[in-house]
Amino acid sequence: MERLHHSLGILQEHILQNRYTRRELDEFLTATLTRFSDWMARLVALRKVRDHKLSYLDFPHGEFRRGQRDIAELVYKCIDQGGQLMVEAPTGIGKTMAVLYPALKALAEGKHEAMVFVTARTVGRRAAESSLALVALQGPETRALSLTAKDKICFSPGKACHGDDCPFARGYYNRLPGALDAALQLPTLSRANIEAVAREQEVCPYQLADDLLPWVDVVIADLHYLYSLYPRLG
């Protein structure tokens, strides 16, 4: 087997040759597919538990505020029937929970696969995180991931994002399974939690958050992530 590496900076090509027996390739493929199958089975199991618990989720505040139920019903109908919805409501009415609650109920019913909550302000991110924390008190095992800009979460500022320059990129994919396993033990993947797991597992926190996207139910992100998130969520 030949692999061609092209170094753009110095305009050089490097050809690496490796020889494997058929048995070695068969064993590698079998082991790889087994690991992948185990991860997919785990994902299915997590979602079954999540959907079961969300089906019994009550509105976290007990009673809806004036106008809050109307928003929640509109959000649910929009998800169920498709389309777009724009809502304008006074400050303090509880818009964040009025959006998240019906979206979570629809998630349990299989009407969509994931939620993306984008906001232009830090206060919006905190409102979403606190609302989901209230939901978690009832027991639903929904996993929320708060994305942080690369320049703010990077452990090696000023270094290139590859193994030759950054120790957290070196051997990243060898340590990724352990990092994913540790992260998935946490119900909320805030910036602090992502950084803690990344330091413990010695992996890049920004890349870890990116690789966690298929595993989470709610993504909370800055408005600038809007156009890049959907392809990554698949």
Question: Which stretches of residues belong to each language-model region?
Answer:
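A helicase ATPase "motif cassette" and its flanking acidic/Ser/Thr-rich regulatory loops
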Residues: 14-61
